[in-house]
From Swiss-Prot:
Entry function: Involved in cell division and chromosome segregation.
Protein known as: Probable cell division protein WhiA
Family of the protein in this entry: Belongs to the WhiA family.
Database matches in Pfam families: HTH_WhiA, LAGLIDADG_WhiA, WhiA_N
Species: Mycobacterium tuberculosis (strain ATCC 25618 / H37Rv)
Keywords from the UniProt entry: Cell cycle, Cell division, DNA-binding
DNA-binding annotation, residue ranges on this chain: 275-308
InterPro entries: Homing_endonucl, Sporu_reg_WhiA_N_dom, Sporulation_regulator_WhiA, Sporulation_regulator_WhiA_C, WhiA_LAGLIDADG_dom
Length: 327
C-alpha cells in the first residue's frame, strides 16, 4: 500500500491548468469513487475516498468548476473498516452536478461508463480520466514478478472506457473480471512507468523505477550465481569421474600400460581438480592440454578394450551415482 499512497498523495497535490482536464478528473473521480443516490426524492452525488487530501481536492474542484458546495464526512477506522474513509456528498445540487459532469444523460438516466466528452476529449482529458480513476480506486504494487498498476471499476463499461483512454496514451491496459469485480490492469514495467508520468506522478515513478532496476539487478546477480554454482558442480563431478576412470584403467592395464600414458593418467589422479591446461604445465616435460587429453583418452580406450576381452568391468563401471553425489 505504501506506493499506492505515495502516488495518490502526489496526484492530490498536482496543479492542473486546463479546465477541460480538471472537469474530466472530477467526472472520473465521481464515477469510480461513488455514485448517485436518491434521498428524499432528490439526486445525491457521493464519493468515498481513502485520503483526506483527495477529498479536499475534489471538494475544491467541484466548487471552483461548478459552484456547488460539497460536504465531507470522516468515517474513522473501526470494526471491519480498517482505515479512515472520507465520504464527500453533494445533496442540494446533486442532480445539477450529475448532469454537468455527465453522470446523468440528457434524459436524466445514469451513464454507465464515462461520458462522451471525456472519452472523446483531448489527451489531457485522457490523462485526467486516469488520474481521477486512480485517485478513486487505484493501486500500485512494489516492482517484482507480480507488479501491477490496477484500478477497480464500477462496471464493465467504465473499465472499457479506461482501457480506451490508456490506448490513446500509448499504454496497454487490460480489463478483467476478478471474483465478480471489474478491474483494469497494467502489468508491463515500462507501461506502468509511462502511465505514472502521464497521470502526473513523476516523483513516484522515479522511486518505482529505481526499485524496479535494483530488483532486476539483484535477480540477474542471483541467476548468474546459480549458473556459476551449477557450472562448478558439473566441473567437479566431471573431474571426479575422470580420475576414477583413470584409476580403474591403470588397474586393468597394470604393467602393460605404456609409460607416457601412465604418466598422464597419474597426473590426472594426483591432481583431480586441476584443468587439462594445468596438468600440461605439471607434466615433465610440459605438454599442451590437447596432448594431455589425447593421452588420457587413449589410456581409457586401451583399458576398456582389454576389459572387454578379459570379461571384467570397464572404466565406466566405477562412475556410480554415489560417486557423483559425493563430488
Amino acid at each position: 500500500m505504501a506506493m499506492t499512497t505515495d502516488v495518490k498523495d502526489e496526484l492530490s497535490r498536482l496543479v492542473v491548468k486546463s479546465v477541460s482536464a480538471r472537469r474530466a478528473e472530477v467526472t472520473s473521480l465521481l464515477r469510480f469513487a461513488g455514485g448517485l443516490h436518491i434521498v428524499g426524492g432528490r439526486v445525491v452525488v457521493e464519493a468515498e475516498l481513502d485520503l483526506g487530501s483527495i477529498a479536499r481536492r475534489l471538494r475544491k474542484e467541484i466548487f471552483e468548476l461548478y459552484g456547488y458546495t460539497a460536504v465531507v464526512h470522516v468515517l474513522s477506522a473501526s470494526g471491519i473498516r480498517k482505515s479512515t474513509r472520507y465520504v464527500l456528498r453533494v445533496a442540494n445540487d446533486g442532480e445539477a452536478l450529475a448532469r454537468q459532469t455527465g453522470l446523468l444523460d440528457m434524459r436524466g438516466r445514469p451513464v454507465r461508463g464515462l461520458p462522451a466528452q471525456v472519452v472523446g476529449g483531448s489527451i489531457d482529458d485522457a490523462e485526467a480520466a486516469w488520474r481521477g480513476a486512480f485517485l478513486a480506486h487505484g493501486s500500485l504494487t512494489e516492482p517484482g514478478r507480480s507488479s501491477a498498476l490496477e484500478v477497480s471499476c464500477p462496471g464493465p463499461e467504465a473499465a472499457l472506457a479506461l482501457v480506451g483512454a490508456a490506448r490513446r496514451l500509448g499504454v496497454g491496459a487490460k480489463a478483467r473480471e476478478v471474483r465478480g469485480a471489474d478491474r483494469v490492469v497494467v502489468r508491463d514495467g515500462e507501461a506502468i512507468g509511462a502511465l505514472l508520468t502521464r497521470m502526473g506522478a513523476q516523483d513516484t515513478r522515479l522511486v518505482w523505477e529505481e526499485r524496479r532496476l535494483r530488483r532486476e539487478v539483484r535477480a540477474t546477480a542471483n541467476r548468474l550465481a546459480n549458473f556459476d554454482d551449477a557450472n562448478l558442480r558439473r566441473s567437479a563431478r566431471a573431474a571426479v569421474a575422470a580420475a576414477a576412470r583413470v584409476e580403474r584403467a591403470l588397474e586393468i592395464l597394470g604393467d602393460t600400460v605404456p609409460e607416457h600414458l601412465a604418466s598422464a593418467g597419474k597426473l590426472r589422479v594426483e591432481h583431480r581438480q586441476a584443468s587439462l591446461e594445468e596438468l600440461g604445465r605439471l607434466a615433465d616435460p610440459p605438454m599442451t592440454k590437447d596432448a594431455v587429453a589425447g593421452r588420457i583418452r587413449r589410456l581409457l580406450s586401451m583399458a576398456d578394450r582389454k576389459a572387454k576381452v578379459d570379461g571384467i568391468p570397464d572404466t565406466e563401471s566405477v562412475v556410480t551415482p554415489d560417486l557423483l553425489e559425493d563430488a
